[in-house]
Amino acid sequence: MLQKKVLIVDDSPAQVKLIEGFLEHEGYRLVGINDPERVEEAIANERPSVILLDVVMPKRNGFQVCRELKNHADYNAIPVILVTSKNTESDRFWGQQQGADGYVTKPFTREELLRAVRRFA
């Protein structure tokens, strides 16, 4: 059976490490990047099963990246889970409007993150 890949996109290396720590013993192949400008390259190279995408990042925020991925014919079927401290109802609504498949609010527990990833990967 092919190992499921999770692409983690967060400008904070510490946050990427935290997420990797939560998922490393769950059988997923983990790919972490800190630059939202490299998302398309990482997807093309890795073909992830699911993307965990931070919202608050420099240059391109997660809402923008999500919208661009969902409008791209080659990438729109890949589930995107937004991972963010933005936790208002309007933030969640805006994420859905951009095409996000899931939403995890920081701080999150290991179980919350696993539940979201398992739903799609």
Regions found by a protein language model. Name each.
Residues 16, 58-59, 88:
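The feature encodes the CheY-like receiver
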Residues 108-117:
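C-terminal output helix
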